[in-house]
Amino acid sequence: DLMPYETSLEGRSDYLAAADKTESLSFALPFDKNQNEDPLFARYVVAVNRGGVYEPVSNEAYVTNPEVTSDYQEPFPEAQTKKGLNIELSMLDDAMSLGVKHTAINISVREFLDPNGALTYDYNGKTYRFNKSRVEEYDKTIRMFSNKGIIITGMILNGWNTSHPELLYPGVKETGTSQYYMFNTSTPEGFETCRAVMAFLAERYNGSDPNYGQVSN
């Protein structure tokens, strides 16, 4: 298996399963989503040992049905109409009068991931801090939209972040023309912080707590 920050099998001598040469083969691997290197994020490749060096002989493949491992198995909500509109909380009454049942919310990681934040979240053995007041603003907006039966799509944005530079791809430089940047999963540190942020959002806004509401996409 190869994690997102691994680019090749060079130097690797470990493997998840082994089989003798045959016309076809299949592997069954144990799954533990609580392990440090979550297998859902890995890509898998078949390799052969040639002179002590493992060489790939297949394409790389990902797990194609990760949803079956989710703790949250509620059905996707059905909207009463197809009508959608990008709205702010102050526009909610107008949106309801128009029959709006879909909207998108920009979720800026830079705004709520705060090393001095009062809201803590433990993930994979590490504690992350979030800006409590900013998160509560998201809570209010998402809750009020959800309570009106509006299906929410979250647009997760990665702005320039000097407090968490690991979220930025190595070598990228801040520009005056770019507001947002690609999330970095090419390093272990960036990958871990990205995992933590996405896990926090998924746990908070999965709809199980009415105080937070639900982001469906």
What positions do the PLM features span?
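Substrate-binding cleft and catalytic face of glycoside hydrolase catalytic domains
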Residues: L98-N217
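Residue-identity detector for glutamine
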Residues: Q35, Q73, Q80, Q179-M182, ...
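Beta-strand-enriched, solvent-exposed domains that form extended recognition/catalytic surfaces
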Residues: D1-D71
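Short linear motifs in intrinsically disordered
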Residues: N34-E37, D71-E78, L119-Y123
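Extra-cytoplasmic beta-strand recognition segments
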Residues: F27, L85, I150
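Proline-rich intrinsically disordered, low-complexity coils
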Residues: P4, P30, P39, P56, ...
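Boundary/entry segment of secreted carbohydrate-active catalytic domains
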Residues: P30, F41, Y54-V109
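Solvent-exposed loop and beta-edge segments used for protein-protein assembly and interaction
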Residues: K21, N36-L40, P77-A79, S146, ...
